[in-house]
């Protein structure tokens, strides 16, 4: 499994997990976060390996679709980059730095 894809799916899962069904959440979490194989998931839920594979592939598409429409992850990345740039540009402005850190903290609490 590609590390980049795994990281992306884990991140999208963090942002959109609550929009998935329980079954989708379980399979994606076991496969990507807990590194279970398709066979291990199939055995755990007493279904075929192919059924697990199909569900994971559909759920990956669903997660990508949510990101295409809602942009929560991409906006989060851009927002953090902008905050970092502002902190570097104005390191002596303590008021600004504290407010930027508050914004970062809010973002971290949400996700």
Swiss-Prot record:
It comes from Lactococcus lactis subsp. cremoris (strain MG1363). InterPro entries: RNA_pol_sigma_r3/r4-like, UPF0122, UPF0122_fam_protein, WH-like_DNA-bd_sf. Signal peptide: none annotated. HAMAP family: UPF0122 (MF_00245). It comes from the Bacteria. Belongs to the UPF0122 family. This is UPF0122 protein llmg_1069. NCBIfam families: PRK00118.1-1, PRK00118.1-4, PRK00118.1-6, YlxM. Pfam families: UPF0122 (PF04297).
